[in-house]
């Protein structure tokens, strides 16, 4: 299956798993936003430290604006394969097209590592 049009770079599975883990840790020890509306607001306000975007969102237009907005605001983002897993990592019982970390809490080192790897992928 080809990637959706909003996916601008390939994320290795190992990195996506770390992103889910960072979101879970930040959920418990820091602050997160879940869902595209909350994520978009956090990016616009430049509160987000890292944005997670699911690759299996339908229709794509739900999250298609996020990569461009993140680039405009200088906020790193990472793609994860599953909106269901993203919702679970965010602590909700439904799928989440996107989520973001506002305060990484105990996940700070992990978030820094993810951001560094994403920057390498985008070079």
UniProtKB/Swiss-Prot annotation:
InterPro entries assigned to the protein according to its UniProt record, in alphabetical order: eL8/uL1-like, Ribosomal_eL30-like_sf, Ribosomal_eL8-like_CS, Ribosomal_eL8/eL30/eS12/Gad45, Ribosomal_eL8/Nhp2, Ribosomal_eL8_arc
Leader peptide range in chain numbering: none
PROSITE patterns assigned: RIBOSOMAL_L7AE
SUPFAM superfamilies recorded: L30e-like
Annotated keywords: Cytoplasm, Ribonucleoprotein, Ribosomal protein, RNA-binding, rRNA-binding, tRNA processing
Gene Ontology CC entries for this record: cytoplasm; ribonucleoprotein complex; ribosome
Oligomeric form and interacting partners: Part of the 50S ribosomal subunit. Probably part of the RNase P complex.
Primary role: Multifunctional RNA-binding protein that recognizes the K-turn motif in ribosomal RNA, the RNA component of RNase P, box H/ACA, box C/D and box C'/D' sRNAs.
Similarity annotation: Belongs to the eukaryotic ribosomal protein eL8 family.
Name of the molecule in the record: Large ribosomal subunit protein eL8
């Amino acid at each position: 299956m080809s990637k959706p049009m909003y996916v601008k770079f390939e994320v290795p599975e190992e990195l996506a798993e770390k992103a889910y883990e960072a979101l879970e840790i930040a959920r418990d020890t820091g602050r997160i936003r879940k869902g595209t509306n909350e994520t978009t607001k956090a990016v616009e306000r430049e509160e987000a430290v890292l944005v997670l975007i699911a690759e299996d969102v339908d229709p794509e237009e739900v999250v298609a604006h996020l990569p461009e907005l993140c680039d405009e605001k200088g906020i790193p983002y990472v793609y994860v394969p599953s909106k269901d897993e993203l919702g679970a990592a965010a602590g909700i019982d439904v799928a989440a097209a996107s989520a973001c970390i506002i305060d990484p809490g105990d996940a700070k080192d992990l978030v820094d590592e993810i951001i560094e790897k994403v920057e390498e992928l985008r070079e």
